[in-house]
Amino acid sequence: MLNRTIAKRTLATAAQAERTLPKKYGGRFTVTLIPGDGVGKEITDSVRTIFEAENIPIDWETINIKQTDHKEGVYEAVESLKRNKIGLKGLWHTPADQTGHGSLNVALRKQLDIYANVALFKSLKGVKTRIPDIDLIVIRENTEGEFSGLEHESVPGVVESLKVMTRPKTERIARFAFDFAKKYNRKSVTAVHKANIMKLGDGLFRNIITEIGQKEYPDIDVSSIIVDNASMQAVAKPHQFDVLVTPSMYGTILGNIGAALIGGPGLVAGANFGRDYAVFEPGSRHVGLDIKGQNVANPTAMILSSTLMLNHLGLNEYATRISKAVHETIAEGKHTTRDIGGSSSTTDFTNEIINKLSTM
């Protein structure tokens, strides 16, 4: 009975993945491109330049929306993604002041039900870090938890914020995490929670991850850890973790720790998946407002995210070539950006990648 259940679920997952893939028109894919705020245009321009040099069969539908456009501005991006099914995206800045609007990033994910965020934290040769050989994946639920956006001021000076956790969405992210681990030969999945305090909400999350792991994925080790301890352990002994699956807020916290471990936010590739749509973006949430327009941003995270997109589209050879060129450029160390110890501009780094591609 269990094997039959797993088979049915696997077939359903495969069918969903098939629906996610966009269609080719004239042998080419159309991809929604959302540069976003901060250094978004500079790092997406880097990707466009590399793709053009490689003659990759992709056309861009560019949606220029800024954080100042408020949630109404997300409509254009949503409609474009509904047409194209796939996107490459920078980050929108979310103001922290009380008068600011809600997150456009969250609004986009919720409207399209892009429920799974994947961030890849892997050490790169040539980048000096405190701890070598990091290889960690953080998968977080994108559409509920603390990021449900449900809060109000009941009376002046008293604010209530609601954290929503549901069984269906937790089961969905659990199976996504275990399927991902299985596909990429990962040995363990760890649920991150705060069930010692939020016994119902985080208790539900922890229990469902554990239950599904034990019943449906016996070949993958499943465990759980309180988020405070997870943060400490990630800094002290990161190699003990393989795949971490988290509610929304904990994933952003651990993601920043992961970025610090491998050398900074400019190195973290990421992606977001839903039933019908996939959006690829840097895995660490840093907009770079302070260096906007200076041509010093590290485009590695965006470039590597674009290679994940190419693999998703079945353009694996292009993805492999570009990824190899990026890794060789960083390992060589002669044309790297200042965040990882170099002095090259975004443009110089991009051009060196293209030079390496031309000799492959």
Curated annotation (Swiss-Prot):
Stored PROSITE patterns: IDH_IMDH
Organism superkingdom: Eukaryota
Enzyme class: oxidoreductase
Binding site for substrate: 109, 140, 228
GO MF terms held by the record: isocitrate dehydrogenase (NAD+) activity; magnesium ion binding; NAD binding; RNA binding
Keyword DNA repair listed: no
EC numbers, comma separated: 1.1.1.41
Record text on activity regulation: Allosterically regulated by several compounds including AMP, NAD(+), and citrate.
Keyword terms, alphabetized: Allosteric enzyme, Magnesium, Manganese, Metal-binding, Mitochondrion, NAD, Oxidoreductase, RNA-binding, Transit peptide, Tricarboxylic acid cycle
Names of the cofactor(s): Mg(2+); Mn(2+)
Misc note: Present with 10500 molecules/cell in log phase SD medium.
Protein name per its UniProtKB record: Isocitrate dehydrogenase [NAD] subunit 1, mitochondrial
Lineage: Eukaryota, Fungi, Dikarya, Ascomycota, Saccharomycotina
Gene: IDH1
